[in-house]
């Protein structure tokens, strides 16, 4: 298999990826807390890891991908109380809404989407294990992790224990051994959901949930753990302490964190009230445009949100749709004549596919990978123009370009519906029919029968077929393709 280098947050270095089991990759990514509709910052890790999983499968890995839903949380409880509803109704509503957004952006399903509420026994067992091993202590009806018992606490975030309080989600309790100790289990409060436990009625703390669910599905040690860079501390730092404290094994080999979506260089977040809901963006822009926007830079880099960038993304999707349609036209033509132009097209296909792989092998750099896609699209347009000028088609060269572009775009997950439209078994007969219609229209124009020529154009337009008159002859395409 290809050698992939990834930037590991734990080591602060880019290193060669070595799977725990040859040919297999196990991945856990922290999902959303479903108390509201997802903003586009929440969509970034989903799209990022969708592409990573697609690429790993493409190069031959068997991938097991788990992404959770934190369906028991203060924000969900507060939302339910405010609406006079219950926590499960709220979480179900926004989980459904999350999947609608993911479907619009062609994000494939993870293998498992565990919910906290379905794994209470796993969580309770892990908390008890940490108590038994001296890493946790009971304080009233609460249970806390004693961070002084874990030697490597702070290794992921590069922080010292004394510096870890600023900006952290830490439970305040005067009886804690250390100010930075965090809740594993919280005693029940009036108006909140609760579960029975050895320490009384209560519910889990934020961090223990992901530790318990990831170990349950992927084992004590697995390959990749992902999420937004805002989760490095305290969430992922605490996951390491919990999981390794309980199992005695290394928790994760490679930690990958995506950068923020920013607005005017400030992080997009619901707490700052400077966010855009993904569902609202998708009312104005296609799922392909939003997906491409999220992939337009390498995942670790910040990505500044603007309408101008989304407008440009939409235009790029329209251009690529045209290129796919052009490839379809070329592939339907007969011919096997090698020319300098066809050899240039073959070379562009090979070089673009190679550049795409090199970009993805270098820490999944989709910014460079999309550049390879557009380089190939440009080469296809150049070849198409040459064919319009009378050059004979070389079907083999077109097929190589077709395969290369489709491979790249399948991995990026872009314009899948457009490819599906152009892959129907009736395409050749459809193309042949259109060639006849355009030939009749061209004859009418030569005979100055403009009314008939215009009527053909207008009727085709009404049927969703757009005619483009060029200096080298008429071309057609389906509207929206």
Task: List the predicted regions and their residue ranges.
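Short, glycine/charge-rich beta-strand/loop segments that flank catalytic centers
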Residues: 69-74, 95-98, 108-123, 141-150
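N-terminal, positively charged nucleic-acid-binding surface of large information/translation enzymes
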Residues: 11-14, 20-108, 472-476
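Structural preference for alpha-helix termini/caps and helix-kink/transition segments
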Residues: 267, 276-481
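Anion (oxyanion) recognition and catalysis
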Residues: 57, 131, 461
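The substrate-binding groove and active-site-proximal loops of carbohydrate-active enzymes
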Residues: 80-87, 111-117, 200, 228-229
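Alpha-helical recognition segments enriched in aromatics with Gly/Pro capping
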Residues: 1-35, 49-50, 100, 121-329
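Short phosphate-binding/catalytic loops that engage adenosine nucleotides
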Residues: 61, 135, 465
């Amino acid at each position: 298999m290809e050698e992939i280098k990834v930037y590991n947050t734990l080591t602060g270095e880019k290193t060669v990826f070595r799977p725990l089991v040859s040919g297999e990759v196990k991945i856990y990514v922290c999902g959303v807390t479903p108390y509201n509709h997802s903003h586009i910052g929440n969509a970034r890790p989903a799209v990022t890891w969708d592409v990573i999983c697609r690429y790993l499968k493409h190069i031959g890995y068997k991938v097991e991908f788990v992404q959770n839903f934190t369906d028991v949380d203060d924000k969900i409880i507060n939302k339910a109380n405010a609406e006079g509803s219950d926590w499960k109704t709220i979480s179900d509503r926004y989980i459904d809404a999350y999947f609608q957004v993911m479907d619009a952006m062609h994000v494939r399903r993870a293998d498992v989407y565990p919910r906290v509420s379905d794994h209470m026994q796993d969580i309770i067992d892990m908390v008890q294990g940490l108590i038994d091993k001296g890493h946790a202590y009971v304080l009233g009806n609460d249970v806390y992790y004693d961070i002084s018992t874990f030697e490597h606490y702070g290794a992921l975030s590069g922080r010292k224990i004394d510096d870890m309080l600023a900006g952290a989600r830490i439970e305040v309790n005067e009886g804690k051994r250390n100010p930075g100790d965090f809740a594993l289990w919280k005693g029940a409060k009036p108006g909140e959901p609760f579960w029975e436990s050895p320490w009384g009625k209560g519910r889990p703390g934020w961090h223990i949930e992901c530790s318990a669910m990831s170990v349950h599905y992927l084992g004590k040690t697995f390959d990749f753990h992902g999420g937004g860079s805002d989760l490095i501390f305290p969430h992922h730092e605490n996951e390491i302490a919990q999981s390794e404290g309980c199992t005695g094994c290394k928790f994760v080999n490679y930690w990958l964190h995506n950068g923020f979506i920013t607005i005017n260089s400030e992080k997009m977040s619901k707490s700052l009230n400077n966010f855009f809901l993904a569902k609202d963006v998708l009312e104005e822009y296609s799922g392909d445009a939003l997906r491409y926007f999220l992939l337009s830079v390498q995942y670790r880099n910040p990505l500044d949100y603007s309408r101008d960038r989304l407008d440009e993304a939409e235009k790029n999707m329209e251009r690529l749709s045209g290129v796919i349609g052009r490839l379809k036209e070329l592939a339907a033509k007969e011919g096997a004549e090698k020319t300098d132009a066809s050899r240039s097209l073959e070379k562009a296909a090979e070089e673009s596919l190679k550049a795409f792989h090199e970009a993805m092998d270098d820490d999944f750099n989709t910014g460079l990978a999309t550049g390879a896609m557009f380089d190939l699209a440009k080469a296809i347009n150049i070849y198409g123009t040459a064919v319009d000028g009378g050059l004979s088609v070389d079907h083999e060269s077109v097929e190589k370009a077709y395969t290369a572009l489709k491979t790249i775009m399948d991995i990026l997950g872009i314009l899948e519906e457009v490819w599906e439209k152009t892959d129907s078994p009736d395409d050749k007969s459809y193309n042949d029919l259109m060639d006849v219609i355009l030939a009749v229209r061209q004859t009418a124009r030569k005979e100055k029968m403009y009314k008939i020529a215009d009527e053909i154009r207008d009727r085709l337009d009404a049927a969703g077929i757009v005619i483009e008159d060029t200096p080298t002859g008429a071309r057609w395409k389906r509207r929206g393709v």
